[in-house]
């Protein structure tokens, strides 16, 4: 049966690498309420406090679902293209990353893709049991803007650098389906229907933010 990967960017944090702000906590609470009826096998989150706390708050609405820390869900550079292949603004942005970040990030991204976006026939033991019982698999990944953009770009067969510009608001919801024998499908992207207007668009670049909605 199909595998469904739910991707949520962490809630607003203040300061940037600290715990969630009050806004971020409310965003996470509403996200948990939105997802409370999904039969998740697990909630995976990156190691940074803002992702871990978002996952914990969401999990309060999903009793019994295990919460699992996962380095693959961290905040890193998923792909480092040749600057000559990029629009100038993107090339300038990527110039700020170190050689180590350019080397290690793509390794983590490749491992994350193998773990969370595997093709049909590459299931782990639990997924094989689900398949034998004709059950869809649902997993929630609480992570960061870059990795969500990377997984979406790969699902759509876009050029490897095109994770750039696929931005997520805090606690926006993206869902990718991996049906057996078929290409991945993007079910929703950056969905914020569970957030009131005053809690939307945080963390989103002002230059491409809609005027309202």
PLM regions: where:
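Active-site metal-binding loops of divalent metal-dependent hydrolases
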Residues: 11, 145, 192
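Conserved beta-strand termini and adjacent loop/short-helix elements that scaffold enzyme active sites
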Residues: 8, 70-72, 189
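Internal catalytic-core helix/loop-beta-alpha segment
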Residues: 96-136
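Phosphate-coordination/substrate-recognition cap region in phosphate-metabolizing enzymes
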Residues: 29-100
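Acidic, low-complexity terminal tails and accessory targeting/binding regions
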Residues: 1-2, 64, 75-85, 123-137, ...
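Loop-to-helix element that buttresses phosphate recognition and phosphoryl-transfer chemistry
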Residues: 3-58, 105-106, 110
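Active-site signature of alpha/beta-hydrolase-fold catalytic machinery across serine-
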Residues: 57, 150, 154
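Generic beta-sheet signal
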Residues: 5, 135-146
């Amino acid at each position: 049966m199909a595998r469904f990967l739910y991707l949520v960017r962490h809630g607003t944090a203040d300061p940037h690498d600290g715990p969630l702000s009050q806004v971020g906590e409310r965003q996470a609470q509403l996200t948990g309420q939105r997802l409370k009826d999904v039969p998740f096998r697990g909630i995976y989150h990156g190691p940074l406090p803002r992702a871990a706390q978002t996952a914990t708050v969401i999990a309060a609405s999903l009793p019994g679902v295990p919460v699992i820390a996962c380095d693959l869900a961290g905040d890193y550079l998923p792909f480092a293209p040749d600057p000559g292949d990029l629009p100038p603004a993107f090339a300038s942005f990527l110039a700020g990353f170190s050689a180590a970040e350019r080397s290690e990030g793509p390794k983590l991204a490749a491992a994350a893709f193998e773990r969370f976006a595997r093709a049909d026939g590459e299931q782990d033991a639990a997924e094989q049991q689900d398949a034998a019982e004709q059950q869809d698999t649902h997993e929630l990944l609480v992570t960061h803007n870059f990795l969500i953009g990377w997984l979406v770009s790969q699902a759509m067969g876009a050029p490897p650098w095109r994770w750039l510009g696929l931005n997520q608001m805090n606690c926006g919801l993206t869902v990718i389906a991996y049906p057996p024998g078929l290409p991945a499908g993007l079910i929703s992207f950056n969905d914020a229907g569970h957030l009131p207007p005053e809690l939307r668009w945080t963390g989103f670049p002002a230059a491409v933010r809609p005027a309202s909605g």
